[in-house]
A protein has these predicted regions:
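Catalytic-core signal marking the mid-to-C-terminal active-site face
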Residues: 11-200
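Histidine-centered divalent-metal-coordination microenvironment in nucleic-acid enzymes
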Residues: 1-13
Length: 200
């Protein structure tokens, strides 16, 4: 499937905070740490269709919660470290997401990282599309199904804080209905083509 990568820059006093080396306890480092820490529970919002999860781990879509500078197998990468275009790139979202919810929650996750002074983990400079390179690293994985993503969100203390209860309850309910409808379909591929192809 297609990706809808979210690119974000942080600026303070006219300076791009993603420029140059990113210290683990810097503002930019804490922002990225927050995004990574909350990435599993955000997945139901960035990847809202059952088919979204077929993409993870192939076609340059991430599977693990990790970051690096130029490595496209990571969840977060830093594509540029010099000039005005310095930024972080979140590579998991897809075009089916509601951009207002997805971007808003990614920003909230990053700000939570800053507020709680989260420390950025070390970068992973391996090709995580290769199972032999990923093995033994002990990396947390993104949800592998929409049902798993809903469960991660429902159990999230962070999302309980930042989302209205009525909104989140209705959203999770609709996502689980999607899962049930697909399972009940006689031909799941045809069901997805009819219901989702034009949307994505």
């Amino acid at each position: 499937g297609s990706g809808l990568h979210i690119n974000l820059s942080l600026c303070m006093d006219g300076r791009n905070l993603f420029e140059g080396d990113i210290a683990p306890d810097s503002i930019a480092g804490s922002f990225m740490a927050g995004v990574l820490a909350h990435s599993r529970e955000l997945t139901v919002f960035t990847n809202p269709l059952p088919n979204s999860y077929q993409r993870f781990g192939c076609d340059e879509a991430p599977r693990y919660v990790s970051w690096s500078r130029q490595n496209r197998s990571q969840l977060v990468r830093i594509p540029q470290v010099k000039g005005n275009n310095c930024r972080m790139e979140l590579r998991s979202p897809d075009p089916a997401c509601n951009p207002y919810l997805a971007v808003g929650l990614v920003l909230a996750a990053g700000l939570d990282g800053i507020e709680h002074r989260m420390v950025l983990q070390a970068p992973i400079n391996k090709n995580l599309f290769d199972p032999t390179e990923a093995a033994g690293l002990g990396l947390e994985r993104l949800p592998s199904t929409l049902e798993e993503a809903v469960q991660a969100a429902q159990e999230s203390e962070f999302l309980h804080r930042v989302l209205p209860e009525e909104l989140s309850h209705r959203y999770y309910e609709e996502e689980l209905k999607r899962c049930a409808a697909l399972k009940a379909a006689a031909d799941s591929a045809e069901y997805e083509r009819v219901h989702y192809f034009n949307a994505i």
